[in-house]
Amino acid sequence: MNSNLQEKYLAILQEELVPAMGCTEPIALAYASAKAREILGCEPEYIVAKCSGNMIKNVRCVTIPNSGGMTGIETACILGAIAGHSENKMEVLEKVTEEQRAQTKKLLEQKRCEVEFLDSDIPLHFMVEVSAGADSAMVEIRYSHTNIAKIEKNGETIFIGDENEATGGGLTDRSVLTLENIKQFADEVPLNLVRPMIERQIRYNMDIAYEGISGDYGLGDRKSVV
């Protein structure tokens, strides 16, 4: 495999193995909500999340990281707007205080976030609109979890991102991926170039597995199997 193609494959591997705090779809919603709040310039009074059917399916019953056990799209959006730091991207909810969790619960009870169905053929596609008084902001994400396709402030478009599926979000072009090249990369890549990424992945996955065995999560299938 030539060095140029190998570099692209290494870049793709790095992009696909980005650590995320929790299930990726709700984290993406929290990221968009945090970004929208930054554009708005203040804490929003109301949030509307327009989500594709696939997003709704993948988030509606998922526990949101650092939420204290709360679930769903509304929680992800409200917590992201209150406590999220968009510069941390997929670790946007890394730092959440008890006060912010309590505030999120209160806003959920007040129904400050509404979820709407977004009719889209793109599985990962959603928009988060936030508003306060007469001001509003909107962040649209397509294709990948942090690929911002559009940002609006008070109805005016202030940013247009990459809407191409293969390159969206500044990612390496996936069109270079073929079965033949993937096998060649796996056979020939020097281990020292992939070892740090793979070892981190193994460590994280083992930590998750041990936590699943020791804690009470979901239906408890892992415990019953072990």
Language model features with spans:
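Short glycine-rich or small-residue beta-strand-to-loop segments that form or flank ligand, phosphate
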Residues: Q14-G22, A32, K50, V59-I64
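Conserved small/polar residues in nucleotide/adenosyl-binding loops
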Residues: V225
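Alpha-helical support elements that line or immediately flank enzyme active sites
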Residues: P26-C42
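Catalytic-core signal marking the mid-to-C-terminal active-site face
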Residues: E45-I47, C51-Q201
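Short, conserved micro-motifs enriched in small and acidic residues
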Residues: G22-I27, S67-T71
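Generic N-terminal amphipathic, Lys/Arg-enriched alpha-helix
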Residues: K8-M21, N181-D187
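Short, N-terminal intrinsically disordered low-complexity segments that are rich in Pro/Gly
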Residues: N2, L17-P26, L191-R195
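Active-site helix-to-loop segments that bind/position phosphate- or nucleotide-bearing substrates
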Residues: I198-I202, A209-S214
